[in-house]
Amino acid sequence: MSGNTGERPFADIITSIRYWVIHSITIPSLFIAGWLFVSTGLAYDVFGSPRPNEYFSESRQEVPLITGRFDSLEQVDAFTKSF
């Protein structure tokens, strides 16, 4: 027979007023914070990913595709020189 861990049952937690008062504030706050994090462009700066208008430069408009099997290192070097 299993023992009692002393924790509240889940049904008691989600039916309590205190739970919904706390979570009615925190869940929308997290959503708004995430939306602001992405919409302001801070996510691009934090993670170092290029913004949508920075994927291709003015000098290089084609996709950097490796075509050769044996000269791939030279192709990668040529692609990285354009950055």
From Swiss-Prot:
Pfam families: Cytochrom_B559 (PF00283), Cytochrom_B559a (PF00284). PROSITE patterns: CYTOCHROME_B559 (PS00537). The keyword Oxidoreductase does not apply. It is found in: Plastid, Chloroplast thylakoid membrane. The chain crosses the membrane at residues 21-35. Its cofactor is heme b. Its main location: plastid. GO terms for molecular function: electron transfer activity; heme binding; iron ion binding. Heme binds at residue 23. With its partner (PsbF) binds heme. PSII binds additional chlorophylls, carotenoids and specific lipids. It comes from the Eukaryota. It is a single-pass membrane protein. GO terms for biological process: photosynthetic electron transport chain. SUPFAM superfamilies: Cytochrome b559 subunits (SSF161045). Keywords: Chloroplast, Electron transport, Heme, Iron, Membrane, Metal-binding, Photosynthesis, Photosystem II, Plastid, Thylakoid, Transmembrane, Transmembrane helix, Transport. The keyword Transmembrane helix applies. GO terms for cellular component: chloroplast thylakoid membrane; photosystem II reaction center. Heterodimer of an alpha subunit and a beta subunit. PSII is composed of 1 copy each of membrane proteins PsbA, PsbB, PsbC, PsbD, PsbE, PsbF, PsbH, PsbI, PsbJ, PsbK, PsbL, PsbM, PsbT, PsbX, PsbY, PsbZ, Psb30/Ycf12, at least 3 peripheral proteins of the oxygen-evolving complex and a large number of cofactors. It forms dimeric complexes. Belongs to the PsbE/PsbF family. This b-type cytochrome is tightly associated with the reaction center of photosystem II (PSII). PSII is a light-driven water:plastoquinone oxidoreductase that uses light energy to abstract electrons from H(2)O, generating O(2) and a proton gradient subsequently used for ATP formation. It consists of a core antenna complex that captures photons, and an electron transfer chain that converts photonic excitation into a charge separation. This is Cytochrome b559 subunit alpha. It comes from Adiantum capillus-veneris.
